[in-house]
Amino acid sequence: MKQLFSLFICCLMATMSLAQEVYTVDNLPNVHLHDATRYVCNPANILTPVATDSIDTMLYALEQQTGIETVVAVLPTIGDADCYDFAFALGNKWGVGKSKSDNGLVVLLVTDQRCIQMVTGYGLEGHLPDAICKRIQLNDMIPYLKNNQ
């Protein structure tokens, strides 16, 4: 009986260690605060370091050339939270975009919900309206992700 109980405890502990952390806007690490050249929050290492570095480099150049502030968050789960609401709240909490021009862009990928969400600040909506964001998702991002690239 004691061995069975020990086996049960071991299995329970193993199951608990495999449980994914549910990310919230409050517990998500803001990598840009620690390093101004980083724009990709990838706490579960879903993206490879090479992919993360490549995106960081592109977004740094974009900000230097245009002033557009962007953050990309790649997460395994946000629990039952809505992707749009999460992305919107993340942009507000992290202050993505200049306050005067409100030119921020948040790109959120949540693997368990199979969700890609792009949220733009009001100052960016004229250049990047929802229709163009959706087209980018459908024509570029989703096929790329389906090919595991």
Regions picked out by a protein language model, each given a short descriptive name:
Residues M1-T24:
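Bacterial Sec-dependent N-terminal signal peptides
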